């Protein structure tokens, strides 16, 4: 269940803080946002991307010099929504540190690799999966041809970025993303998608 669905059911824990002015309650995600922690949980779509982008921009305006932590547990989803997050991660001034909890697949893995170099992490039992973008089309033959060309261009764009982020040769990225390619946390580090596997907070 995604964070937003959980919130809709009223199951998000509340945190109560004491201050000189009395008590204040926050939902847990708002409290963690104060600590500069953003979550991507569940599928990547336009709604989720809009929330993540807004949080990145807010945290940049709050403190442009302090790192942002981005926790990812996602099966992937829309390429255009994912690219909106990717571009904003690079656009904002603070470094964005990424951490895989559970699974980062498809666009989730792409965003995991998009973290600041040296600040991309995974918990030890997490899984990561990369593959080529998929899409379906219908309509006239010419429309299907246009869509197919666009998917091929997108695949080329994503592969080039992955090669740059991992240090792997483009030919290997192209070969590995031809089908679903699963990695353990340690294999993910060896591949260059992350920089470190962590089991305890330093």
Swiss-Prot record:
- The protein depicted here goes by the name ATP-dependent Clp protease proteolytic subunit
User: Its biological function?
Assistant: Cleaves peptides in various proteins in a process that requires ATP hydrolysis. Has a chymotrypsin-like activity. Plays a major role in the degradation of misfolded proteins.
Assembly behavior: Fourteen ClpP subunits assemble into 2 heptameric rings which stack back to back to give a disk-like structure with a central cavity, resembling the structure of eukaryotic proteasomes.
> Which NCBIfam families would you find in this protein's record?
clpP (TIGR00493), PRK00277.1 (NF001368), PRK12553.1 (NF009205)
Similarity remark: Belongs to the peptidase S14 family.
Recorded source organism is: Albidiferax ferrireducens (strain ATCC BAA-621 / DSM 15236 / T118) (Rhodoferax ferrireducens)
Q: Write the record's keywords in alphabetical order, separated by commas.
A: Cytoplasm, Hydrolase, Protease, Serine protease
Gene Ontology MF: a single term: ATP-dependent peptidase activity
Q: Which reaction equation describes what this protein catalyses? A: Hydrolysis of proteins to small peptides in the presence of ATP and magnesium. alpha-casein is the usual test substrate. In the absence of ATP, only oligopeptides shorter than five residues are hydrolyzed (such as succinyl-Leu-Tyr-|-NHMec, and Leu-Tyr-Leu-|-Tyr-Trp, in which cleavage of the -Tyr-|-Leu- and -Tyr-|-Trp bonds also occurs)
Enzyme Commission number, as recorded: 3.4.21.92
Report the subcellular localization.
Answer: Cytoplasm
- What PANTHER family does UniProt report for this protein, alphabetically? ATP-DEPENDENT CLP PROTEASE PROTEOLYTIC SUBUNIT
* One protein family per Pfam: CLP_protease
- CDD domains xrefs: S14_ClpP_2
Entry's Gene Ontology BP terms = protein quality control for misfolded or incompletely synthesized proteins
**Catalytic center at which residues?**
106, 131
Question: Which PROSITE patterns is this protein grouped with?
Answer: CLP_PROTEASE_HIS
GO CC terms in record: cytoplasm; endopeptidase Clp complex
